[in-house]
């Protein structure tokens, strides 16, 4: 079993912790709690770089080693880092999801990359414009953190 953790922080009140775990070559379970969000859906992605020296903007674009367009987690064509949306109620998004494209090892490893929660709902690449195919029109980056291995 491989485990990883990400502590999310931003310039505002948004913060949280996300845990990742993977058994052998199986899917990755992603479980987290993010506080300080407005109610509703917020895009949640893995970005290419583990760099937050200039805030979350330093994390770069979505993790996309196969040069595909943005999509929903269940789509055949998507960025590896496209994990869809988390939904906040009373300011808190508590979620558990499973993804078969990200990994904690190998070519699709997310270790050392940033997880980012966005200000708006991810349109899952179905917004009908160029930005939708890049970012899902998810808007600004509210909080981010580097994903690291843990016990």
Curated annotation (Swiss-Prot):
Binds 1 copper ion per subunit. Zn(2+) binds at residues 62, 70, 79, 82. GO terms for molecular function: copper ion binding; superoxide dismutase activity. Disulfide bonds join 56-144. CDD domains: Cu-Zn_Superoxide_Dismutase. SUPFAM superfamilies: Cu,Zn superoxide dismutase-like. It is found in: Cytoplasm; Nucleus. Keywords: Antioxidant, Copper, Cytoplasm, Disulfide bond, Lipoprotein, Metal-binding, Nucleus, Oxidoreductase, Palmitate, Zinc. One of its GO terms (cellular component) is nucleus. Belongs to the Cu-Zn superoxide dismutase family. This is Superoxide dismutase [Cu-Zn].
């Amino acid at each position: 079993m491989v485990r990883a953790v990400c502590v999310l922080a931003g310039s505002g009140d948004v913060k949280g912790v996300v845990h990742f775990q993977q058994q052998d070559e199986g899917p990755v379970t992603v479980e987290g709690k993010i506080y300080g969000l407005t109610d509703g859906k917020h895009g949640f992605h893995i970005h290419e770089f583990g760099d937050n020296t200039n805030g979350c903007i330093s994390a770069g674009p979505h993790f996309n080693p196969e040069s595909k367009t943005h999509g929903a987690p269940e789509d055949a064509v998507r960025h590896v880092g496209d994990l869809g949306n988390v939904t906040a109620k009373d300011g808190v998004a508590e979620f558990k999801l499973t993804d078969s494209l990200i990994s904690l090892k190998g070519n699709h490893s997310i270790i050392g990359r940033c997880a980012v929660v966005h200000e708006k709902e991810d349109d899952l690449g179905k917004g009908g414009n160029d930005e939708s195919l890049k970012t899902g029109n998810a808007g600004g980056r509210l909080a981010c953190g580097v994903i690291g291995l843990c016990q």
